[in-house]
Amino acid sequence: MLTINLHGQPETEFSPFDWVTYRQTGRIQSITEGFAYIYFATEEGGILRYHTFQNQFDDPITQAQGLSSNNIRSLHFDRETGTLWVATKHSLDYSYTREGNWTSIPYGNLALPKNVHIRRIGSSPAYVWLDAGASYLKLDRVSGISLGVFTIPDEEKILWSSSRVLAGINIPEDIANYTVTEGWLLNGNQFLDPFGRTIDITSFYQTRFSDIWLGAGDGTLFLGDAQMETFYPFTFGLANSDITTFTKENDFWTAGRSGFTSGGITRFNPEELQFDLFDFEVTINMNDQSIYSSVDTGDEIWFGGEIGILVYKKKEKFWRLIDEAKGLPGGHIITMDHDTSHVWVGTSRGIARIHKDSKRSRLTGIEPFLHESFIYDIEVIEDQVWIGTSSQLYVYHQDQQALYDFRDMGDLSRISHQQDLLKNFWEIYEYKQWVYIASEKGLIAYDKKRGQWSMVFEKAHYSGRKINAMAFSDEYCFLGTNFGFDRIDLNRFFQRNYSYPFLGRVNDLFISDDVLWLGTNKGLTKFQWTKDF
């Protein structure tokens, strides 16, 4: 019996790449060649695609396109049918379009153990073959129906795609002496990276045009030029997949929770699909820590984490750490924003104002009042600093050097019956003449021109879930939660919920024209949101 698994795929009205997710790749596990693309199976990042005629990477194939998993064990392109076959941890997936419309067959339906490891996939003129180590499975190349299990294939002319090699690859002598650019060295069946670390070669493939591809254990890909006798390294993917924050300029700087694999910070150019990784393990002055907030001040990028703030000076290309010795109040740095001369820092234990040049705290007088307060969000709006905490919403007027309870400013008549019930002010967002605040009770707004407060909608519109991020575009409001996100029409209050498994927890949002960017615990996702009407 075949099972079509669409649990990770959006509705059919979406085109395959209306949703795209970028992740940490992990090891390169397998390589195959299609009509126009070289496909790379990765440990964590789905399938990477390199366009052989344009000589560039395109958007990857992940669960956002309908794959059953982002952990790809092996893959194979069947040239006779144009089908891309993919072995994941628990199922065999295939697609005739090689983009979307994926069919997933659990291994149990193929009379294979659920935890079988498919080492490689191949095809003969008539069938598709799976190498499961101790046995070989013959499949119908159109339907994927099992046609038998063999200890040895009953065909000889099987074209196999490359597989992951655990014991090391024996590099052919004619390429063993190739040079490698960008500070890498080829040493037998391993690479030495620019920092002196040994990186295993995990996959080898030679194309029909005699190009040579090597995949490495850290996700780096190497393209070999036979005429130049040179390998060129490529990096595609993020330093980690749990994205809690990203900056919103031309280049996105992404960061998140540190995990078991080496973490870091990524500079990502979405137009060129270029990734520059700053690895905690080897980058000077970078400390391994989870990052929860970021702000681009123009000359610098600030990242707030568990043990302090990492500051990157763009011109000097230099990192430094600001910690409690410079006046931080301690606790995880949850939020940051900046004015002309200072960066305002909110932590799980209070607030601080750090001078941009000296990198030291400059006291305002409000620090004792907010001591041990959980600061959810800070938004600098003109000469005011809006501060959302677990118990209260404050507005600090810098010119007056005075801290106000939000109830002490403006006309409260439209929320008078709810003003004393409001708490947990999670997110603050300025859009046009409005300041929007997401709270446990609902979304409230302050009209800066009229000085008037209003309740936009109550918590029922987002089922009482915690709001982690907000974004606005004309009449549309986007709310990121622990279970995807909601789009709400502020004129008609029509709600659209997006809770696909490949989204997970949405931590950060940004709208750039027709594209909604989402930082989630499953990666950095872009969505062509205006197509969904």
Place the predicted regions along the sequence by residue.
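Carboxylate-rich, polar loop motifs that coordinate divalent cations or form catalytic acidic clusters
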Residues: 1-533
